[in-house]
């Protein structure tokens, strides 16, 4: 199995069924987003929401994984990123199924009457600190424009009773996010702790919350095996997307 991930051209990534340019986005497409887009439960969903769409990566991954009848709304605050997401989506096989909205999610959600079976977000998680190179990158990295309580409240306002709200976060921040979500009435239903290899502690966590109570399923995902090739589990999760798997 090849170790190459995706062909690099024009400041983006070529996946098996679509290309993502991200040179105008503050936060680039990377492993976190790919993990989340491949992992989020999509069985039976009819409508999806991507909060903080960036380059459109998550919306495109969900489109690839779902039936042609599933509609996806992708909301992005930063205008250049939203424009690039729209371009990426227009060049994909699913342009008619994904709607990009250049908007503040906290305002956009108040105007919606539909509810979503799946809400997905690769959210900012840094507190205000070291100054970023651009205001756009600061907006993407820091919780100043969308803090975690606001994100959880926003998702709660537009999710179906049996829907899932899925995020990817650094391990320790994910633990705090989980405590906050539980205190706000969410129920943790799925958790996958992600480690680079068996010898390392998990550095990322994938979380799926629901308004509906139920059993929580937890597991661990190791990205690379002892030979430094991608593990069987990581390959099984992502091979529908990576070009050379």
From Swiss-Prot:
Record EC number: 2.1.1.223
The protein in question is named tRNA1(Val) (adenine(37)-N6)-methyltransferase
* Protein function: Specifically methylates the adenine in position 37 of tRNA(1)(Val) (anticodon cmo5UAC).
Q: Where in the cell is it found?
A: Cytoplasm
Q: SUPFAM superfamilies from the xrefs? A: S-adenosyl-L-methionine-dependent methyltransferases
The alphabetized UniProt keywords are:
Cytoplasm, Methyltransferase, S-adenosyl-L-methionine, Transferase, tRNA processing
GO terms in the biological process aspect are: methylation; tRNA processing
A GO MF label: nucleic acid binding
> Would you name any one GO CC term?
cytoplasm
Report which gene this protein is encoded by: yfiC
Q: Which family does it belong to?
A: Belongs to the methyltransferase superfamily. tRNA (adenine-N(6)-)-methyltransferase family.
Does the keyword Coiled coil feature in the UniProt annotation? no
PROSITE patterns per the record? N6_MTASE
Instruction: Write out the catalysed reaction.
Output: adenosine(37) in tRNA1(Val) + S-adenosyl-L-methionine = N(6)-methyladenosine(37) in tRNA1(Val) + S-adenosyl-L-homocysteine + H(+)
Kindly report, in one word, the top-level EC class recorded for this enzyme. Answer: transferase
Q: Name one Pfam family in it.
A: MTS
NCBIfam families listed in its UniProt record: tRm6a37MtseTrmN
- InterPro entries, A to Z: DNA_methylase_N6_adenine_CS, SAM-dependent_MTases_sf, Small_mtfrase_dom, tRNA_Adenine-N(6)_MTase, tRNA_adenine-N6_MeTrfase
Species annotation: Escherichia coli O6:K15:H31 (strain 536 / UPEC)
